[in-house]
Amino acid sequence: VWTKRIETGEVVTAQHWKNGRELTPSEMSQRRVAELLKKIHGSKPLLNMLKRMEMEPITPNIMLKKINASLSRDVLTHHIIRKALTYLEDHIPNLDSRFFTVVHGDVNHNNWLLSDRDELFLVDWEGAMIADPAIDIGMLLYNYVPKQQWSNWFNTYGVKESMDLNKRMKWYTVIQSIGMIQWYEEQKRFKDMNTWLKFLNEVMNSNLFI
């Protein structure tokens, strides 16, 4: 990733162009996906780059304030949305910002590129932030990795599964799902919105003890 601050004060970022294809949803549980995500989260050069861009850490409270301000009246009519917002208010994660890392923010399979040389890349860094890595981990696992494979995924990534991590993953997946629902509602893509409403309901009903 290459960055440069221009005269307006904005920062331009770029990546080398690579020929290849997107990963399929079924490929997202592969070992190399977990390994690359860990490499990104642990990258000091990437973290320092974001700090040079004067990027401030994104805390759960900031995310919650932003999502509450963005929701339309129509989205708020959905019972699962109101239930999810109550959950978010009652379960705000508490992770020391010293443990925040580079977070991509959109680990959808469309953003994983497998090059002609069988090299894996994570592209589209517009939403990159300094935040809790559980933001990426949660969305990836809930969307693409069967629950019975989570333990193996954690081992590959190099983190010990814990109640705290599971709580944070669920919280961030819920709040990002609400954001997707609002976005699709604004775009009037109601089929996609309903898909995310169903997904949100599944996440809310999973791991009911957290």
Spell out what each predicted region is.
Residues E89-I135:
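Active-site acidic catalytic loop and adjacent metal/ATP-binding pocket
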Residues S151-N152, T156-I210:
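Helix-rich C-terminal or lid/interface subdomains of diverse kinases
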Residues L37, L64-I67, A134, W150, ...:
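A general structural signal for well-ordered alpha-helical segments in protein cores
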Residues I6-S26, N61-S70, S177-F190:
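A glycine-centered beta->alpha junction motif in the catalytic cores
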Residues S115-N166:
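Active-site Asp-x-Gly
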Residues P45-G105, N207:
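An alpha-helical support segment within catalytic cores of ATP-dependent transferases
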